[in-house]
Amino acid sequence: MGKMLSQVDVRTYWDFIEPGLREIKKEAKPEWRPEDIYSALASGIAELYVDIEQDPCESFIILQVKPSVFKPTQSLLIWVAYDKRENANGKYMEYIEHMAEQRGCNKVEFWTPWKGLADVLSHIGYETKQYIVEKEI
């Protein structure tokens, strides 16, 4: 199996992950603010995973188990995946997929503004299922 990730407390790792969240915020312009992510993690809505063997910590994953609205299933939704190194999917994807299975999820989902990530994931069995089209009013 791929490299192991460990669930950690955001209060301990915030100083390590905040710069990466701010970088993502600047590049992708998601609706969330880093403070929103902190709140979701501290309140247990989402979970933070890091590679604790990495020093300094420059990669992390924020995820949530998400029930399906229409079926009695659930997915492991990756909110944020950040890694300063190359080939993070090769390092962690097998572990993430195994984690999803162990937690009773029938799929892993990524919501991303980057077509490049969707293209990379398509080479390891992921498929784009829908596009989200919106207009601010």
Stretches found by the model and what they are:
Residues 1-32:
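Short amphipathic alpha-helix that is part of the acyltransferase structural core
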Residues 27-48:
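Active-site rim helix/loop that mediates acceptor-substrate recognition in acyltransferases
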Residues 37-39, 66-69, 98:
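Short, flexible, glycine/charge-rich loop motifs used to bind or transfer phosphoryl groups or to couple energy/partner
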Residues 46, 123-127:
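Short glycine-aromatic motifs
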Residues 64, 111, 132:
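Conserved residues at the C-terminal ends of beta-strands
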Residues 73-124:
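Acyl-donor binding region in acyl/amide transferases
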